[in-house]
Amino acid sequence: NDRVFYFTTCGWMMWNWLVGALSSGATILLFDGFPMYKKNDLLFEFASEEKVTLFGISAKYIDTLNNNGVIPKNNHNFSKLKTICSTGSPLSEDGFRYIYNNIKKDVHLSSISGGTDIVSCFVLGNLSQPVYAGEIQNRGLGMDVDIFDEEGSSIKDKKGELVCKKPFPSMPIKFWNDEGDKKYKSAYFEKYKNVWHHGDFAKITGNGGFVIFGRSDTTLNPGGVRLGTAEIYSVVEKFKEVQESIVIGQSWDNDIRIILFIVLNKGYDLTSEIKDKIKKAIRINA
């Protein structure tokens, strides 16, 4: 009786993921168009009218709703809704709290993470375990997922590289026109011998869950200290003055310095006071 919806284009792997729900006998629902056309909660209106039981969106969409003060539960009936899935980028602790406070308090929130190349999830939700804000609950079935340090040792409660130590059902077996599998091996097995290196910067928490900090190739390394871009975005996005932001690492004086670009909301100027507030918040929380 499940009715599954994930907002996606046909070009994203979540389209394939959504079609896969048919194999379990579920009904799938599609939405074509801009998800905030004329109203911020358009997708929730769709979910309510179509009696969706699993509702899937991106973490960025949740952040946008939160920043705009949208409270979907005030206008829509979510009596059929059992699960909300989030992917595309790390869902912040604030995002978790927003969902439970403003959408539905007794829903199962499943933050999931995998990849287009595997059309699957390495880590995802689990109905038999508690949900902790900011964490992905557990490994996927058949996925021997771990976190390695730079030397290839397994680590807990420390940031490192997300890996899968054994073959798994949905891994690609080769690249097209890749003589000798050189590109394939370079993409996944060059960093750790015979271990799939996925390129996510993450950690395993004391609860046994996972926190994803962003892609390893976007990880900043000022002064030799690794810092995920998601850690900075989660701080900056809380400022009412900031509409959009992007952070990069720039080579500088034999090191890396962090450069933050921001777009302010209407009515605000980039004053010294705003700069200092943002810098202080990043220093304390990231």
Task: Indicate residue ranges for each PLM-predicted region.
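Hydrophobic alpha-helical scaffolding
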Residues: 7-8, 33-37, 50-55, 85-89, ...
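Residues embedded in well-ordered beta-strands within globular domains across many folds
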Residues: 5, 56, 82-85, 146, ...
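Conserved AMP-binding/adenylate-forming
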Residues: 48, 82-209, 216-219
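Conserved AMP-binding/adenylation subdomain of ANL enzymes
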Residues: 1-3, 10-53, 68
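Adenylate-forming
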Residues: 9, 32-35, 52-98, 110-117, ...
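AMP-binding/adenylate-forming catalytic core of the ANL superfamily
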Residues: 48, 55, 168, 194, ...
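Short, well-ordered beta-strand segments
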Residues: 3-5, 162-163, 261
